[in-house]
């Protein structure tokens, strides 16, 4: 006899996942291309709103669903979609998005540096996750540029400059996202 596993997901949770999926797609389309294989988009900032609201489990489901849907051909990423997107320099950031809910859960549990101040605690946790996201994204970008595109010159200074610009803009966005995140959490709990 086989054992049945009862998986119960509320209709409200399914609706939240659907709404946040649509909002994630919209946020990825709000993108400004910058030189040397990079984009500045609202997608990274929006990712930081998904996990606190949906939690690590459903946040992961959402990002995996987003990644798989894009790889299957839906044009939902910043510059399209399809299986060939794994050869885009920005695909590493999408990989990092799927890991972020678990990292965020671990970092937020372990971060007691500012336990008396919720904003600082959340901001530091978000910045740690942002650094992880950019490290994975930058490493993947360098790998693709060097081994797939074969452009060794851009892996140096100019690529570093555009990646730094992208990171600094994300640092500013995450500050405001943290403010919004705390307000949203306060209202839904």
Predicted regions and their residues:
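Hydrophobic alpha-helical transmembrane segments
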Residues: 32-45, 66-76, 108-122, 180-184
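Short helix-perturbing small/polar motifs within transmembrane alpha-helices
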Residues: 1-6, 12-13, 17-19, 26, ...
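Helix-boundary and loop/linker segments of multi-pass membrane transporters
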Residues: 9-13, 37-38, 78, 82-83, ...
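Alpha-helical transmembrane segments of multi-pass membrane proteins, especially transporters
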Residues: 44, 48, 62-70, 84-85, ...
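Structural signal for membrane-spanning alpha-helices in multi-pass inner-membrane proteins
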Residues: 24, 28, 51, 70, ...
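Interfacial aromatic-anchored transmembrane helix boundaries in multi-pass membrane proteins
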Residues: 28-39, 67-100
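Membrane-embedded alpha-helical hairpins and interfacial helices in multi-pass inner-membrane proteins
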Residues: 36, 115-189
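Hydrophobic transmembrane alpha-helices
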Residues: 2-62
């Amino acid at each position: 006899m086989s054992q049945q596993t009862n998986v119960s997901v509320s209709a409200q949770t399914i609706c939240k996942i659907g709404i946040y999926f649509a909002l994630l797609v919209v946020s990825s389309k709000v993108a400004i291309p910058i030189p040397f294989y990079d984009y500045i988009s609202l997608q990274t900032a929006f990712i930081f709103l998904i996990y606190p609201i949906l939690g690590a489990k459903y946040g992961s489901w959402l990002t995996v669903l987003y990644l798989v849907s894009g790889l299957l051909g839906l044009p939902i990423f910043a510059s399209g979609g399809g299986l060939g997107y794994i050869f885009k320099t920005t695909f590493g950031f999408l990989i990092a998005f799927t890991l972020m809910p678990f990292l965020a859960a671990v970092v937020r549990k372990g971060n007691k540096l500012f336990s008396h101040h919720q904003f600082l605690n959340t901001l530091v946790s978000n910045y740690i996750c942002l650094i992880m996201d950019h490290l994975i994204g930058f490493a993947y970008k360098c790998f693709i540029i060097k081994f797939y595109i074969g452009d060794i010159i851009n892996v140096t200074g100019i690529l570093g400059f555009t990646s730094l610009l992208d990171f600094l803009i994300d640092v500013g966005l995450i500050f405001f996202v943290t403010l919004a995140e705390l307000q949203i959490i306060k209202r839904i709990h």
